[in-house]
UniProtKB/Swiss-Prot annotation:
<feature type="active site">
    <location>
        <position position="253"/>
    </location>
</feature>
<dbReference type="InterPro" id="IPR016039">
    <property type="entry name" value="Thiolase-like"/>
</dbReference>
<keyword id="KW-0511">Multifunctional enzyme</keyword>
<keyword id="KW-0444">Lipid biosynthesis</keyword>
<feature type="region of interest" description="ACP-binding">
    <location>
        <begin position="254"/>
        <end position="258"/>
    </location>
</feature>
<keyword id="KW-0963">Cytoplasm</keyword>
<dbReference type="GO" id="GO:0005737">
    <property type="term" value="C:cytoplasm"/>
</dbReference>
<keyword id="KW-0808">Transferase</keyword>
<dbReference type="Pfam" id="PF08541">
    <property type="entry name" value="ACP_syn_III_C"/>
</dbReference>
<comment type="subunit">
    <text>Homodimer.</text>
</comment>
<comment type="pathway">
    <text>Lipid metabolism; fatty acid biosynthesis.</text>
</comment>
<keyword id="KW-0275">Fatty acid biosynthesis</keyword>
<dbReference type="InterPro" id="IPR013747">
    <property type="entry name" value="ACP_syn_III_C"/>
</dbReference>
<comment type="similarity">
    <text>Belongs to the thiolase-like superfamily. FabH family.</text>
</comment>
<dbReference type="InterPro" id="IPR004655">
    <property type="entry name" value="FabH"/>
</dbReference>
<dbReference type="Pfam" id="PF08545">
    <property type="entry name" value="ACP_syn_III"/>
</dbReference>
<protein>
    <recommendedName>
        <fullName>Beta-ketoacyl-[acyl-carrier-protein] synthase III</fullName>
        <ecNumber>2.3.1.180</ecNumber>
    </recommendedName>
</protein>
Length: 328
C-alpha cells in the first residue's frame, strides 16, 4: 500500500509588538488611507531587536508538534523556508533543531521567498511518500522588519514578521492531493535584497546605500501575482482531478488584498471561501501561508474533509500551490 502524506498539525507565532499605519505616518510621507486602500494592511507585527527568525520559528514549531500530538523526538526532518535567516551560516533550520531539541532530525533551509512554505510542503510530501522520513516539520518564518528601507515608503509599509509551521506525515486518507510549482529567473530583479551575498559583499558603502534592504518593483509584481496565483491553483487542481467548484477554502499568500481579490475572481471563488488576515499582519513572506492556515483551522473555517488550496508567489520569481484534503 502506497504511503500518503498529509498535514498532522499546525502552529504559528506572532511577535508581540504591533505597529499600525499611523506609526508610519509619523516617520515617512504616507497615510493610513494610502496604505489601507492600496494594500488592505492596517497593522503588522515586528520582532524585537533581540528576536531572530529562529526564535519565532521555534515557537511556531513547538505549537505544530503539539497539535500533531507528537514529541519533538519524533521529528525526523526540519525544512525551514525563509529569506531572513539568522545568519548566512549555519542554516536557521539547524538553529531551530537545537532550540527545540529535535535530536533525531536532519535540518536545512530553503529560499523561495513568499512561495517558500508551499515549496517546503512539496519537498516534505516526497520524503514522506517515498518512506525516507515519517514526520517532517515544515516552517515558514521571517523577520522582514530587519530588512526594510524606511526611505522607501512603497515597500517599508508592506512587511511584517511571524512564523507558521506544519507537521507533514503519513495519513490513511485525504492528505496532500497534489502540488504545482514554478520559477522564472528572468524576474530576479523584481524582488531582491541586492547586497550581502557573493555578488555584492557587505561593505560600508552597501550599508550606507541601503542595499541590504528589500527592493520591489511593485507594478510588475502585481501583474505577475494576479496571473500566477490563479494559474498555479488551476494546475494543482487539475493534477488532483478537481476543479474550482471543488474548493472548500483558499489560503493564499497575504501580499495585497487587491491581488487576493483579483485572483479569487479569476477562480470564480466567493471571498467567503478565502482566508484574509493581511489587515492584521501585512506581508510576512514565507510565514504568510502557514500563519493563515493555522488561524483558519483554529477559527473553524477549515474542517475535516475540506479541499483546501494553499497558493503563493514570491521573489525569484517563484510560485506554487498545494491541494490538501484536510485530515485534522
Amino acid at each position: 500500500m502506497n504511503t500518503k502524506a498529509g498535514i498532522l498539525g499546525v502552529g504559528s507565532y506572532l511577535p508581540e509588538q504591533s505597529y499600525d499605519n499611523f506609526h508610519f505616518e509619523k516617520i515617512m510621507d504616507t497615510s493610513d488611507e494610502w496604505i489601507s486602500t492600496r494594500t488592505g494592511i492596517k497593522e503588522r507585527r515586528f520582532a524585537k531587536e533581540s528576536e531572530a527568525t529562529s526564535d519565532l520559528a521555534s515557537k511556531a514549531a513547538l505549537k505544530a508538534i503539539e497539535c500533531a500530538k507528537l514529541n519533538v523526538e519524533d521529528i525526523e526532518l526540519i525544512i525551514l523556508a525563509t529569506i531572513t535567516p539568522d545568519m548566512s551560516l549555519p542554516s536557521t533550520a539547524c538553529i531551530v533543531q537545537d532550540a527545540i531539541g529535535a535530536v533525531n532530525a536532519t535540518a536545512f533551509d530553503i529560499s523561495a521567498a513568499c512561495s517558500g512554505f508551499v515549496y517546503g510542503v512539496t519537498i516534505a510530501k516526497q520524503f514522506v511518500e517515498t518512506g525516507c522520513y515519517k514526520n517532517v516539520l515544515v516552517i515558514g518564518a521571517e523577520t522582514c522588519s530587519k530588512f526594510l528601507n524606511y526611505d522607501d515608503r512603497t515597500t517599508a509599509v508592506l512587511f511584517g514578521d511571524g512564523a507558521g509551521a506544519a507537521v507533514i506525515g503519513p495519513v490513511n486518507e485525504g492528505g496532500i492531493l497534489s502540488t504545482h510549482m514554478g520559477s522564472d529567473g528572468k524576474g530576479k530583479d523584481c524582488l531582491k535584497v541586492p547586497a550581502g551575498g557573493s555578488r555584492l559583499k557587505a561593505s560600508k558603502e552597501t550599508v550606507e546605500a541601503n542595499l541590504h534592504t528589500i527592493e520591489m518593483a511593485g507594478s510588475d509584481v502585481f501583474k505577475f501575482a494576479v496571473r500566477k496565483m490563479a494559474e498555479t491553483s488551476l494546475r494543482a487542481l487539475e493534477k488532483a482531478n478537481l476543479n474550482t467548484t471543488d474548493i472548500d477554502y483558499l489560503v493564499p499568500h497575504q501580499a495585497n488584498i487587491r491581488i487576493i481579490q483579483a485572483s479569487s475572481k479569476r477562480l470564480e471563488l466567493d471571498m467567503k471561501k478565502v482566508y484574509v488576515n493581511i489587515d492584521k499582519y501585512g506581508n510576512m513572506s514565507a510565514a504568510s501561508i502557514p500563519v493563515a492556515l493555522d488561524e483558519a483551522y483554529r477559527e473553524g473555517k477549515i474542517k475535516k474533509g475540506d479541499n483546501v488550496v494553499l497558493v503563493g508567489f514570491g521573489g525569484g520569481l517563484t510560485w506554487g500551490a498545494s491541494v490538501v484534503k484536510w485530515t485534522l
